[in-house]
A protein has these predicted regions:
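Lipid interaction determinants
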Residues: 1-92, 99-167
Length: 167
C-alpha cells in the first residue's frame, strides 16, 4: 500500500467532511462472512467527526457500559475496577487523516495524536473507505487494513477477526 504522497482529500472532502453516526461495529472472520462478535453491543454508540481540513475524531462506546459508576462516584474517585469496566467499553482517537487510492480503492491514514489506548499514540490508523448512497443519505463503511486482536472467550478455536465499521 504505497501512497506516494498523493493525498486525495480535496477531491473527496465534500463527501467525507462532517459528522457521522455509527450504525454498526461488527467483528467478522477472515472471510468476512460470519459475525464473530459485537464488542460495543448490538446498538453501539459512536460518532466520527471530520473537519473540512481533515481532522478526525472518532468516539465509540458500548452503551451498556457507558453510564454512571455503580458507586455513584466520579471517575477521579471511583475504584479502579469500576472505572476499568467503563473505560474498556470506550475507544477513541483523533488526528489528521490523509486520503489515498490504490488498486483496492480508497483508504485513509490517520496519524494518531490522542487516543484512549496509549499504544496508538504516534501511530497510523489505516482504514479502507467505501462511500455509498443509501435511501438518499451518504453512507461510509470503514475496514481496518490490519487485523485487530481481541480477546474472545469461547470454547471455539482462535479465529482471525476483521472489524467492519459502518457509519
Amino acid at each position: 500500500m504505497a501512497n506516494n504522497n498523493n493525498d486525495l482529500w480535496s477531491k473527496y472532502q465534500s463527501r467525507i467532511a462532517g459528522g457521522w453516526q455509527l450504525m454498526s461495529y461488527d467483528l467478522y472472520d477472515a472471510t468476512e462472512t460470519q459475525i464473530l462478535a459485537k464488542p460495543h453491543g448490538d446498538q453501539p454508540l459512536g460518532r466520527v467527526l471530520i473537519s473540512p481540513n481533515g481532522w478526525l475524531a472518532a468516539h465509540i462506546a458500548n452503551p451498556t457500559r457507558f453510564g454512571p459508576l455503580p458507586s455513584g462516584k466520579p471517575w477521579q474517585t471511583g475504584d479502579d475496577a469500576e472505572v476499568a469496566h467503563v473505560a474498556r467499553g470506550i475507544s477513541m482517537y483523533c488526528g489528521y487523516l490523509q486520503l489515498f487510492e490504490d488498486g483496492d480503492g480508497l483508504y485513509w491514514e490517520t496519524t494518531v495524536e490522542i487516543s484512549s489506548d496509549p499504544n496508538r499514540k504516534g501511530g497510523k490508523e489505516v482504514r479502507r473507505v467505501q462511500l455509498e448512497e443509501r435511501n438518499g443519505k451518504g453512507s461510509m463503511t470503514l475496514r481496518p487494513v490490519k487485523d485487530m486482536v481481541m480477546e474472545v472467550r469461547s470454547s471455539c478455536p482462535s479465529t482471525q477477526m476483521l472489524p467492519l465499521l459502518s457509519l
